[in-house]
């Protein structure tokens, strides 16, 4: 796999129009991007005009980016025990699926949900039910990706077993997979600091979930310790995970080809340098 074929990018800004996320991706030397299709802190989502979609399509052709990923709203909790907020979450998620379909996006990355102190098993069952409700709206190449979480607060999805439970509940009905956030799984208790640690963790993932369900990575270092369950991203090589971990991801045959999206604090100037450094490892 040549450097030009490596799928590397970052979470770029769609402020002023979704097409701008593509332009920012090109600016940092990315071959792929993640972005918000709508304001991530509002229930009411953006509705695309014909002009929005045409501008997106023409910019996409110019930039030649592939394996595009949307990140859903932070407000959405598909396992919410509060019925009113669960219904709002399901509606917002459905709208997100529709926007992704309109843009021809490949992946919709989402945080599974949070139990808010209620029964965790009920939360997981509610997430499965919520996902099955969007089945009629999924078209084209869109695949839903569960993001492995940090386990902060009452969020679920920080254990591979929880992700496997959700996948097993929907895999026969809709396209599903996992996006591993390196910071998240590290603070959730999975050691990835060395090649041997990564190998052990990937073998565990394969045993519990199955490597064919691993579709993407969020690439972040962590300012917090292994197992701390506190989600704080750091620039690559400046946190508790370290460069060996990211070098492994760029070299190992199980992970090298998968899309990787930076969410490190520092913005476009840092991302350009980090993408270059990751390419050098490959």
Swiss-Prot record:
It comes from Protochlamydia amoebophila (strain UWE25). Belongs to the AP endonuclease 2 family. It is an enzyme of class 3 (hydrolase). The lineage of its organism: Bacteria, Pseudomonadati, Chlamydiota, Chlamydiia, Parachlamydiales. It catalyses: Endonucleolytic cleavage to 5'-phosphooligonucleotide end-products. Keywords: DNA damage, DNA repair, Endonuclease, Hydrolase, Metal-binding, Nuclease, Zinc. It comes from the Bacteria. Pfam families: AP_endonuc_2. Endonuclease IV plays a role in DNA repair. It cleaves phosphodiester bonds at apurinic or apyrimidinic (AP) sites, generating a 3'-hydroxyl group and a 5'-terminal sugar phosphate. Its cofactor is Zn(2+). Its EC number is 3.1.21.2. Zn(2+) 1 binds at residues 71, 111, 147. SMART domains: AP2Ec (SM00518). InterPro entries: AP_endonuc_2 (IPR001719), AP_endonuc_F2_Zn_BS (IPR018246), Xyl_isomerase-like_sf (IPR036237), Xyl_isomerase-like_TIM-brl (IPR013022). GO terms for molecular function: deoxyribonuclease IV (phage-T4-induced) activity; DNA binding; DNA-(apurinic or apyrimidinic site) endonuclease activity; phosphoric diester hydrolase activity; zinc ion binding. SUPFAM superfamilies: Xylose isomerase-like (SSF51658). GO terms for biological process: base-excision repair. Gene3D superfamilies: Divalent-metal-dependent TIM barrel enzymes (3.20.20.150). Zn(2+) 3 binds at residues 184, 231, 233. Zn(2+) 2 binds at residues 147, 181, 218, 263. Binds 3 Zn(2+) ions. This is Probable endonuclease 4.
